[in-house]
C-alpha cells in the first residue's frame, strides 16, 4: 500500500467512525518511519487498524471499509479491523508508538522494533521477508530487536521469536 493509499484509508476511517485516533499495528506502520518503505510494504492491500478510543465501532469500520466492501472494490485496498491483542508485543510497546497524522486523524503506529517482534510471532513467509527487508534497508537495529524479544512475557514465545529471527538473519547472509 502506497502512502497516499494509506492516507485515504485513514481519512475515510476517521470520517466513517467519527474517530480521530487509531492503532496501526501492521506493516503499514513503517510509513511513519520512512518516506520510501520496502517493496514488501507496497505490495500489501490492507492496513491493520483499530479504533483507539471507541472499540465498539470496529464492526461498522469492517462493514464499510473491510475486505469485500464497496470501499475496497473502489480503491483496490481495504482496512483490516483488528485488535491490539492479536499482535504479540513486548512489554512497553504502548509507550513507543509513533504518530502518523493525516488531517484530523492520527494513526498511532507500532515502533519498528515492536513491529518486527509482532511479525516474527506471526511467522508467515511474507512476514519474515518483511523483517528481512527492514534489516536490509537498515531501518532496524538487531540489538534493539533482541532486547524487545526479551521483553515478551512467555519463555516459549521468546524461544520461537529468537529462532525465527535467526532464520531471517541466516537468509540475509
Where are these regions (language model features)?
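Compositionally biased terminal segments of proteins
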Residues: 1-173
